[in-house]
Regions:
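Outer-membrane beta-barrel proteins and related beta-barrel translocases across Gram-negative bacteria
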Residues: 1-306
Length: 306
């Protein structure tokens, strides 16, 4: 704690062993001390006790208060925070908000340091007018791939009288085919789905990808070897409709397959051939009072020489 330039006071320090100590009736602040008896730090932590554990580099505070100009702004019966800059599993500071529709929102996030390249955050939220909501976020970073996923779930929305959920997941990486002539194949996934058309309006803080009205879900494979490259993808949209402001659904690509051959600097010329075949699909019945007689499906194929 002193490495950060902080200082404090205590009524008693009990050294349990070389790695652990208990500091009772303790205060801590990083505000510079000004000489004189009337000095008051801008902010100060007060606790009934700080339990210092240098073995796992953590401090556990009991009956903690954070005071700003001697006015308490945050209190917790117990709170654990790290002594160093390394990531540690534990509860994060609670979040409190007020929404004119959902009411008072109180969130308690728990950070789980699974491994140096993986972590997760589990958050429990109580909304005074809607009820209980659970949020989970998982992140990973591997040598050949990386990604993240987030899932929100409200078992019973008291205002909508239904269960609500939202899913957002992204993955990018390469997979080994096991065939030396093929090598690695790139894999990309982007999935965004919600339970109902009102999700974007009711949960504006659920994440940018889940608060839009056009939610893409796509999966693609891409491969290249020398001058030849190929790509195959499926792209589908979930359109969140509003009867007062309807959206015409975009065409899905189910699937799109593309091949490209490049040849550079052939006697001073560059040449490329691109072949593409795509099947388009769209359901215009999703539009409230939607138009009829419009071609819903189509397909195109072409080859271009450049």
């Amino acid at each position: 704690m002193l490495k950060s330039g902080g200082h404090g006071s205590a009524s008693e320090i009990e050294f349990i062993d070389s790695q652990r100590a208990i500091i009772r009736n303790a205060t801590y602040t990083t505000c510079s001390r000004v000489p004189g008896p009337s000095w008051l730090p801008e902010w100060i932590l007060k606790a009934a006790s700080f339990q210092v554990n240098e073995e796992d580099n953590t401090i556990q505070a009991k009956d903690l208060q954070l005071r700003f100009h001697d006015v308490p702004i945050l209190a917790a019966p117990t709170l654990t925070f790290p002594l160093d800059t390394q990531r540690h599993s534990g509860f994060l500071a609670p979040l409190i908000g007020i929404d004119s529709v959902s009411g008072i929102e109180v969130s308690s996030p728990y950070y789980w340091n699974i491994a140096p390249h993986r972590d997760a955050t589990l958050t429990t939220t109580v909304m005074s007018k809607r009820g209980l909501a659970l949020d989970s976020e998982f992140r990973y970073l591997e040598p050949l791939h990386q990604g993240q996923g987030r899932f929100n779930w409200m078992p019973n929305d008291s205002l909508r009288k239904e269960s609500r959920w939202g899913l957002s997941a992204q993955h990018s990486g390469e997979a080994d085919t096991g065939v030396s002539a093929l090598g690695l194949v790139g894999v990309d996934l982007n999935i965004n789905r919600v339970s109902d058309d009102n999700y974007w309006r009711d949960f504006p803080r659920a994440g940018l990808s889940l608060t839009q009205r056009l939610l893409p879900a796509s999966g693609s494979l891409h491969w290249s070897q020398g001058d030849l490259s190929m790509m195959a993808q499926v792209l589908q949209f979930q359109t969140l409709q509003d009867i007062s402001s309807p959206i015409t659904p975009p065409y899905n690509r189910s699937p799109q397959i593309q091949a490209r051959y490049n040849k550079w600097n052939v006697q001073g010329f560059d040449a490329a051939i691109t072949a593409d075949t795509t099947r388009f699909e769209a359901d215009f019945n999703q539009v409230p009072g939607g138009a009829t007689g419009i071609l819903r499906n189509g397909q195109r194929s072409f080859a271009a020489l450049q």
